Amino acid sequence: MSQVQSGILPEHCRAAIWIEANVKGEVDALRAASKTFADKLATFEAKFPDAHLGAVVAFGNNIWRALSGGVGAEELKDFPGYGKGLAPTTQFDVLIHILSLRHDVNFSVAQAAMEAFGDCIEVKEEIHGFRWVEERDLSGFVDGTENPAGEETRREVAVIKDGVDAGGSYVFVQRWEHNLKQLNRMSVHDQEMMIGRTKEANEEIDGDERPETSHLTRVDLKEDGKGLKIVRQSLPYGTASGTHGLYFCAYCARLHNIEQQLLSMFGDTDGKRDAMLRFTKPVTGGYYFAPSLDKLMAL
C-alpha cells in the first residue's frame, strides 16, 4: 500500500500553516527540494511525537504534468473560478500544508521548508491558522460538523485507492475573509437560517425548514444516493484588528466532489448562491494534487 503524506488524515489539529508558491527554477530542483523537505519533516516527526505533526506537498496542474511526465491525476486542472468572479482563482504551482497540535513546531517545519525549497520557489501567500474555541469558525458556528471521523473513514474519502495515483489526494484551498460586523447586524435566527444549523447547540435545521440557499443545503450533496464527502482541514486565521476569516482546505480522492460543492455554492448549478456570502467572501482559490509519499520521494 502506498504511504499517504502525513498531513492529509489527522483530526483536530490545533494549528496549521499553508504556503502557496510559484516555481522559479527548473523542475529538477523542485524534485530535489521536495525530497529534502520530506526528509527534514521525518526528523521533526520523530523529534516531536506528541505534536502529531503532519505535512503535505502538493502541486498545481502545470507543474504536476512536468514532474510526472503527464501521467496520473487525470482530474487535476487549474482552478477556474466560479460564480462569475465570486470565487476568484489565484492558482499557484506548489502548496505546502503543515499541521499539528503545536504552532511552534509548525513554524520550525515551515522554516525547514523554506530552507529546502530555497530559490526554486517564490512564496505568494503564507497563512497561519489556529483552532478556535470549541472548533468554531470566527462566525461562532461550529466548523466541519459533517467531517468524516476516524482514520479508516477519512482514508476512504480522501485517498485514491489504486492505480497510478494510489495514496494520492486532490487538494483545494480557498481563503475566506469575514465581515463580522456585517454578520453581527443579523439576528441569531437569520444567521442560523443562513448556515442551516443552530449557533449554540450546533443542531441541524430540518431541510424543509431551512432555505435552499443555506450553507448546509448548498454543500450537502448526493449523487445516486451517496453523499459527495470531502475531508476538511480548515482553520480560522488572521488578526483581531485586521483581516480574518476561514482558510478552507479540503482533501478528496475525487476532485469531482469538491467541484460539485463549489458549483452549488456559487450558483453555477441552479442560480442559487450560498447565503453565507452575505458576510464573507473568498479571495483566493487553487486546485492541487498531493502524490503519495512514495511517489513524492521517487519524482
Curated annotation (Swiss-Prot):
Function: Has both general peroxidase activity and dye-decolorizing activity. Can catalyze the oxidation of 2,2'-azino-bis(3-ethylbenzothiazoline-6-sulphonic acid) (ABTS), and the phenolic compounds guaiacol and catechol. Also decolorizes the anthraquinone dye reactive blue 19 (RB19).
Annotated keywords: Cytoplasm, Heme, Iron, Metal-binding, Oxidoreductase, Peroxidase
The enzyme's E.C. designation: 1.11.1.-
Cofactor note (record): Binds 1 heme b (iron(II)-protoporphyrin IX) group non-covalently.
Family membership: Belongs to the DyP-type peroxidase family.
Amino acids binding heme: 215
NCBIfam families per record: Dyp_perox_fam
Localization per record: Cytoplasm
SS bonds (residue pairs): none
Protein name: Dye-decolorizing peroxidase YfeX
Gene Ontology, cellular component aspect: cytosol
Superkingdom to which the source organism belongs: Bacteria
EC class name: oxidoreductase
Ranges in a coiled coil: none
